[in-house]
């Protein structure tokens, strides 16, 4: 099994699990939506659906290029919520706060792995549409 395939399977599993949890147990996700944002439950549902769509795209060969790019955008988009959760973790046990702060730098490999999948799935192709030379 190639490294890229292992990474892809890991991301599919991670995104599927997290996406399902957004619907089965939304309360923890609602609690980490930054206070300034309205419609917290709706945002959680949309982000959960987005994770499931990204997982499905990564799982299917025809969707990997777009799925990788979409996953990178998704991991970038949820980063503020992860920061918010870490900042607001004051009354939690020490190990929990360490885990919340420790996971922030882990967003970087998730984004890079997603981009790697997109790049390798579409080697030499544009993500969307045709190049000017093809038109």
Question: Which positions does each model-derived feature cover?
Answer:
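Short amphipathic, positively biased membrane-proximal segments
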Residues: 1-135
């Amino acid at each position: 099994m190639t490294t890229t395939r292992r990474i892809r399977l890991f991301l599919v599993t991670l995104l599927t699990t997290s996406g399902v949890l957004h619907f089965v147990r939304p309360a923890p996700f609602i609690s980490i939506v930054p206070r300034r944002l309205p419609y917290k439950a709706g945002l959680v549902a949309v982000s959960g659906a987005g994770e499931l769509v990204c997982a499905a795209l990564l799982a299917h060969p025809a969707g990997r290029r777009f799925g990788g790019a979409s996953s990178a955008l998704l991991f970038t988009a949820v980063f503020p919520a992860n920061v918010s959760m870490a900042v607001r973790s004051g009354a939690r046990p020490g190990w929990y706060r360490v885990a919340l702060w420790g996971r922030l730098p882990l967003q970087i490999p998730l984004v890079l792995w997603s981009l790697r999948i997109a790049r390798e799935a579409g080697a030499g192709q544009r993500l969307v549409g045709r190049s000017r030379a093809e038109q």
